[in-house]
Design a protein with these regions (language model features):
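Short sequence/structural segments immediately N-terminal
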Residues: 3-8, 16-114
Length: 114
């Protein structure tokens, strides 16, 4: 089959590149690298739902995380003086976009958020 329209061919190529890069970069690469598929965090609903902290702590031990970050200064981000340990993980940790320092909305803490 011969394509007579170079614009159609270019669009077809672009669609293929975008779809494959989106599938590879949908986020959660760290989880995928460990064999965790999307449904583990997002369920099987369509469209997928954002995971709640209860989902995160099924695999990520909250007490171990608080201990691991206990020496971070000026304060441990996982034991907030405002929220205790009840702050949603997704306030800082984003799998499908850059993570952010939720505390920096009010404070000048220089946390590096994975």
């Amino acid at each position: 089959m011969k394509f007579r329209n170079p614009i159609f061919l270019a669009l077809l190529s672009l669609a293929f590149v975008c779809s494959t890069s989106t599938a590879a970069n949908l986020g959660g690469e760290k989880h995928a690298a460990k064999g965790v598929n999307c449904a583990v965090c997002h369920g099987t609903t369509n469209p997928p739902i954002a995971p709640e902290t209860a989902t995160c702590i099924q695999c990520h031990d909250k007490k171990a995380l608080m201990e691991k970050t206990s020496k971070i200064k000026p304060t441990n981000p996982h034991t907030s003086p405002h929220y205790g340990d009840d702050l949603d993980c997704t306030n800082c940790h984003k799998m499908h976009s850059p993570s952010e320092n939720y505390c920096s909305q009010c404070h000048n803490f220089e946390y590096k958020v994975p």
